[in-house]
């Protein structure tokens, strides 16, 4: 019902070499426009957060049912794409994000600028549950596990270029009964407080 979390370790500051060969530099219009690829990244201030992106209206099933579909409406800062501020000249934003993923040793690629956290602007996912025995109060939500970091890119004789990356490692959805204990996910507990009846087990402090 929800995505598989990945635990990723990494030091606060590290250098990733993108190419074993010499950096390739091309003169542009002056030193400030000098293009250089194959440089190194020094990463710092890596931060992770879990963010609620979509939430279903409170779900109340008076009679037992075999399946249920919940429309998730976007909440908070959604419809966003990964961003890179301060992209080095001659380097794509996707390459910077890929370098961050290499530094973090992620199992799956980080989201790149072509990805978005909801299907379309203003529209959410539809979550379907088919357990065969649904009754009572439920809650459903979607989340993203965001990651952001500062970097300094050094290449050839160019001055270091400093920038900032914001992307995400994972997105997922959940559907749980309000009568169960609190969700393992912070966003699940937040969703339960928004959707479940007061006093439900799912809203208790974990």
Stretches with model-predicted labels:
Residues 14-23, 95-107, 142-146:
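Hydrophobic alpha-helical membrane segments, chiefly transmembrane helices and signal peptide h-regions
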Residues 26-76, 114-206:
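Core pore-forming/fusogenic effector modules of secreted, proteolytically activated toxins
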Residues 1-28:
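Secretory targeting and sorting signals
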Residues 4, 8-9, 62-66, 75, ...:
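Small/flexible residues
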